[in-house]
């Protein structure tokens, strides 16, 4: 067991189908994320079925920030702009501007008012004019592909609601202890038992979704040869963005307990022009050479487009926003799962890869020489 699965024994968590049934029945559930990520548990319910009682429970018992995860299409319906165009938060939580129902509320902050705002926002018959900005409800924009693209509570809430046959929108609230600290592991189990709320994990939701609708598929595989020897080439299609990614496998991955793996995007400076990029030690060629020398390993190249000004700012040594690796991890992890990899040694410097263990992949170490 890895990641959040290490925190929760099977007897203490519910089957994902039971979680979905409770969501469909208008109940709250507790969803725990990856231990290497926020390592928190959120109360989650379907936005369509929220009630003033649920909002009050979240506010008084959960104690965290009550948010409204929504699909991209719902955010577009109300023309919700992002709270900031320079999101530097660790987990890149996609807050939009806050909202309020245009009618039917008083101050906007009461449990009844917030419940009304949420239900107005997800009502299929609502018009864009039915929601105003700012307000007391905080929408979060979910990534396309849900937890298969980003293993966060935002995407989990939307996925669970959709799997329950409802609008792709949920209501979430972090669970805090009475002393103001974040509830972890045992705290969450006790909270769920005390309040008769089922508990599930994002890892289980990812497993369930992968069994039904993985967003990445192999469309070609063949033996190829390059300057570093013979490899097995796979071409992968991203069904959400209609983009193609590539993997090169050396040897038999099953013959090694923890094979060497490198997942990266292409660097124009380093891989095309041969200019070393600051902070990046492994080019495509050096990675393939290292894997070839190892005799067994996997190299994955993710097709990732950089902002137009990224490389110019890089060359001018200007301060730039770090690349977001959310989609790279989501797509890359699906590809690793397709090879049935459970344990890997990562070629590169030690880095915190959020939510990899949500895909049931354990990083056993890093190789950087």
Please give the residue ranges for each predicted region.
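Short, small-residue-biased leader/transition segments that mark boundaries at the very start
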Residues: 1-8
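Catalytic domains of riboflavin
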Residues: 9-369
